Structure formats: C-alpha cells, structure tokens
From Swiss-Prot:
Primary site of residence: membrane
Residues annotated as transmembrane: 22-42, 63-83, 101-121, 134-154, 174-194, 202-222, 492-512
Protein name per its UniProtKB record: Apolipoprotein N-acyltransferase
Pathway involvement of the protein, from the record: Protein modification; lipoprotein biosynthesis (N-acyl transfer)
Gene Ontology BP, a term: lipoprotein biosynthetic process
Length: 518
C-alpha cells in the first residue's frame, strides 16, 4: 500500500515538473510574436495552451504554473537587457545574465498573480465561459497594467504589442495596447475551451474580427488636413564607448551639423536623445551658431541635450531656430526653459539609481554616465517647431501610453520620440522599442517620427505603418514628407480608464459569485 502511494506521489511530482517545463516553453515561444519576428498568431495560441493546462490546478499550483509561463516569456523576450550590463556596465557576463534572470522572475510574478486569482475565483467550475472569456482577460489585463507602474513600471512586451503587425491592430485606436491584451486573453480563453471540446466558444471570434476589420476604421475620426511637414532625422551612429568622452564632444557636434547641412530645406530636423552630450552652458557658442543657421534657413532643429536648472540636471529636448519675435531680436540661443521638454519617466539605474548610497559602490553598472537625472513635470506643453506642435517622448517614455496621451491635443501635429539604443547592440531590444512606438501612433492617430543614435530611425504613419526607415548601425539622414492629420481617436479621448473599470467590475462579479458558491 505504502509502495503504491509513494509511486503515485512520484508520478504526480513528475507530471507537475513536466507541466512547469511545458509552461516555460509556451511562455518562451511568445517572444516570436514581437519584433523582429512579429508572428502575431503565436501569442494567443501559447496562452491558450497554458490556460488549458491550468484548468484543474489549485491556487498554489496555478501560481507556479503561470510563474513558469511568465518566466519563459520574459527570460527570452527581454534577454537583451543583459547587453548593457556586461558591455557597458562593467559586470561579468554570468552576473549580468543572473540580474536579467532576476528581473524576468520579478516580471513573471504578474502572470503568476493572474493564475492565482483565476484558480481562487473559479475553484468549482474551471471549464466555464465565465472563467475563460471574462475573468481570465480581466485578471491578465489588470496585472499587465500593474506591471506598467509598480516600482516605476516596466510595460514591455504587453500581450497587445504582439498585434502591432497583426490583424487586430486597428482596435488599438479604440482600446489601446492594453485593450488588445484583453482581447488576446479572450481569444486564448476561447481556444482553450475548444481544447475541452466546447467549440461554440469560437463564436466570440466573430464580433472581434468584425470590429477590427470594419467597425474600428468606420469609427475613426482622423482626417487628412491636406498639409504636410518635411522632416530630416539624423542618425549619427556615435559609438557608445565614445559618446560621453570629453574629447569626442566637438567631433560629435560637428558631425551632426555636417549631416544636417544638406537638409536645411526640411521644416524640422531632429537629432537623437543626448545628441549633444553636454550641459547647455558648456556648448553655448555652438548653440548660438546652430540657432542662427536654423533661423537663416527657415528650419527648426530639435535636439537632445543635457539641461540644468539650479542644481538639477535633466535629459531634455530643445528647439533651435524658433523664429519668434524674441529670436529675431536676439539671434543667440537663450536657455530660459521655454520650448523645452524635460524627460519625466526616468529609467531606473540608467538615469537614476534608487538606494544609490548602497548600490553605486558595488559595481560600475550602478555608475553609468549621466545616471543622476532629475525628473521633469508629468505634463508639459508640446514643442513648437516652425509653427508645428510636436508631442515628445524621450526613449523609455514611449512605453507609457497614458503619459503621451495626456500630452496630445487637437493641435498636435506630430508625435516625436528620440532614443539612444546603442546600449543594447544588435539585440532585439531596439526593434521592440520601435514596435512600441508604432503602437503609440495607432492609439493616438498621429504620425510619429523616431530619431535614434544608431537605429531604428523611422517615420510611422497614423495607422502604425513604417513608411520610411534607415538601416541600423549606419550613419545617415532620413528625409521624408509627412501628410498631417486632424481629429482624435477614441483612445485619445478616453484612454485606459473604461477598460480598467470594466476589469475591476468583472473581478467584483467574480468575488460575488465565489461568495454565493460557498
């Protein structure tokens, strides 16, 4: 008898271990849904198989099942994070990979909480339409939303981003990337029910497909204005190892000016994040001359720079050649804080170090150049460039949809994001970053321009399509004429709030149902 019990326990243990391995593999496969692969169909299929596997699990087992799925998703999907740590942060490769794995494990806690909640709410009915088509999407969406702001947030590879090149992307103009995560989870729930031979659940795909293909475009209030703006996006391709070296400052400035010289016919010239790798006061003569050149050629130059206010330093964007009355009276550049954008959402470790007194002595990784920035205001006016209103986001900020949405208004002509993704080499990180920027264009219904140090530098239309781009890791200038549009998308009007209210209401219903069942 004892032998039989022991054999049964060992078999059950092996099955549990196998389930965790399969969950990890399914999670890892979701990385193929994001750039550069963009195999959008993989995410809902992998999620549906993981959901099907978890149907009969108790809360503890469900937690670890989805923890394994999440760890696979992030360990593979954001494996590029370690590149900056070992290449530029001074950490040995094993240490950088270990830190990346710890980050992936932390991020996996959010899918794990989804699994825990799913099992807790539905212990008596794990095959129901309610569980798969409503409760699971609500839990998944709320945990993804939480991942976007807890501990400053890391809203990378949301499930919704898998649709940036997929057939459902038009829905983002109504419900945003987070709403697409809800839809992906709902589709996964329907597929999981099919594995249990409940085929009628597939009917949920019909209204989703109809809305994506027909209703969403009909609801669009985005219309062309008949006007256009010509832009020139400069990709300097400055080696990251040289970027902050004092002897490289003036060669860098001259390189950007020389590259721009043949494109002074553009309305707006954009240089990337921290293209001028020095405080304004150190390069005042250069700024004065660049301002005069921009005015003489009737163009504007938007450039990344380090600005200073009292004792604080900011990762900023400024506009040279503003053409207002003040500029005409005094052609020199005046650093008065007007027509300037200061980055608000700073990157932990890269731009500020939490517990810096403790962490900075540990390794060079915690002493990266310019890792002591102050935070700009959450809401700042659009930049004005030759009469055009530009809503900016610097690097990491483009991943936060509500922040950019709050900056866009009916008068906004362009979305602008600048970045320096040289930290991540030839990895998938910069390509995923580009994918996120494309989603912001769909959500807000505005063309987007993206200028980077070494790629991806690109122009995106209001539907999220890349219309022009430079090759990565090359020096060059991308020149494009962009048709302007007007109007607001539904997401620009309402944001994520209705979706979050819906998800919260579904959880409340789930709690009431559970209480009644007890």
């Amino acid at each position: 008898m004892l032998t039989n019990i022991r054999a049964f326990a060992q078999q059950k243990s092996r099955l549990s271990a196998l389930r965790l391995v399969l969950a990890f593999i399914l999670g890892a496969s979701t990385a193929l849904s994001f750039a550069p692969y963009s195999l959008w169909i993989i995410y809902p299929i992998a999620m549906s198989l993981a959901l099907w596997q978890s149907e009969s699990l108790n809360p503890k087992a469900s937690f670890f099942h989805w923890l394994s799925f999440g760890f696979g998703c992030f360990a593979v999907g954001i494996s590029w994070v370690h590149v900056s740590m070992d290449t530029f942060g001074g950490l040995p490769l094993p240490a950088s990979v270990a830190l990346m794995a710890l980050l992936a494990l932390y991020l996996a806690l959010y899918p794990a909480l989804t699994g825990l909640g799913l099992a807790w709410f539905t212990r008596t009915n794990s095959h129901s339409l309610w569980r798969n088509l409503l409760l699971f999407p609500a839990l998944w969406t709320l945990t993804e939303w939480a991942r976007g702001w807890v501990l400053t947030g890391f809203p990378w590879i949301w499930a919704g981003y898998s649709q940036t090149e997929g057939p459902l992307k038009a829905l983002a103009s109504i419900i945003g990337a987070l709403g697409l995560s809800f839809i992906i989870a709902m589709i996964a729930g329907a597929l999981a029910l099919c594995f249990s031979k409940r085929y009628k659940s597939l009917l949920i795909l019909l209204p989703i497909t109809a809305v994506a293909a027909w209703v969403a475009p009909k609801l669009s209030q985005i219309q062309p204005t008949g006007e256009s703006v010509k832009v020139a996006l400069v990709q300097g391709n400055i080696p990251q190892s040289m970027k902050w070296e004092p002897e490289a400052l003036w060669p860098t400035l001259l390189k950007y000016m020389d590259l721009s010289r043949e494109h002074f016919d553009a309305d707006i010239i954009v240089w990337p994040e921290a293209a001028i790798p020095a405080p304004e006061s150190m390069v005042q003569d250069f700024l004065d001359n660049a301002n005069k050149v921009a005015n003489l050629n009737h163009t504007s130059i938007i450039t990344g720079i380090i600005s200073r206010q009292q004792e604080d330093f900011y990762n900023s964007l400024i506009v040279l050649g503003n053409h207002n009355q003040k500029q005409q009276d005094n052609p020199d550049y005046e650093s008065d804080g007007s027509n300037q954008f200061k980055k608000h959402h700073l990157l932990p470790i890269g731009e500020f170090v939490p517990f810096q007194a403790l962490l900075r002595p540990i390794a060079p990784f915690f002493n990266l150049p310019m890792s002591s920035f102050a935070r700009g205001d959450y809401l700042q006016p659009n930049l004005s460039a030759l009469g055009h209103k530009v809503a900016p986001a610097i690097c990491y900020e483009i991943a936060f949809p509500e922040q950019l949405r709050d900056s866009v208004n009916l008068g906004t002509d362009l979305l602008l994001t600048v970045s320096n993704d040289a930290w991540f080499g030839t990895s998938n990180g910069p390509l995923q970053h580009m994918e996120i920027a494309q989603m912001r264009a769909i959500e807000l219904g505005r063309p987007l321009v993206r200028a980077t140090n070494n790629g991806v530098t690109a122009v995106v239309d209001e539907n999220g399509n890349i219309t022009a781009a430079l090759p990565q890791f090359e020096t060059g200038v991308l020149s494009a004429t962009i048709p302007l549009v007007t109007g607001q998308t539904w997401f620009a009007k309402i944001g994520q709030t209705p979706l979050l209210i819906l998800c919260g209401a579904l959880l409340l219903v789930g709690f009431i149902r559970r209480q009644k069942q007890q």
